[in-house]
Amino acid sequence: MKTIFLDLATIHAGNSHSSLNADNVLTIGNFDGVHLGHQAMLKQLKQSASEQQLDTMVMIFEPQPREYFAQLKSDLSSAPARLTSQDEKLTLLAEFGIDTVVVAKFDEAFRSLSASEFADMLVHHLNVKSLVLGDDFKFGHDRTGDSEFLRNYGLPVTNLHTITDTQVVDTQESSLLEDKRISSTRIRELSAKGDLKTVS
């Protein structure tokens, strides 16, 4: 597995990672814990890559966005505890057979990217040809970008439906089952309550 450490300062200096990569299908997230929801996303990523004859690429963030904003507020306790370290994430993603992981430096420059600038970066610097995203994925400054924005930009997007404890539910129903949604946040809450049976 190839690991790319992405710093916008480097990109703005004129350096590109495009020569390092084949064409890619990308998914984006914290992937903290690589739980069942993440695993479903990665399986869909690999399926899409196989169908489109592309390499698999995962973008994660360092620090994680909530950690960055907690530092800004000088309130580190407001950031959730990690389920996995960066090195553990990279190991898990390698074991899953991902071709490339992009570790994006989440800083003021990154959080200030407009949706268009973010999409430009994916296409021109990371050779992204399509994406696999969760149904609630937002990006860009003030979270103005979403899957529909990317489609209008010209990037095909496969949306994975919400993963719950017992089933995969349709996107339209996902808001009704938010309490059952598999997420790193929910796993932390269940662990804190000692509900290890549900966590596993």
Locate predicted features:
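Nucleotidyltransferase catalytic core that binds NTPs
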Residues: 1-200
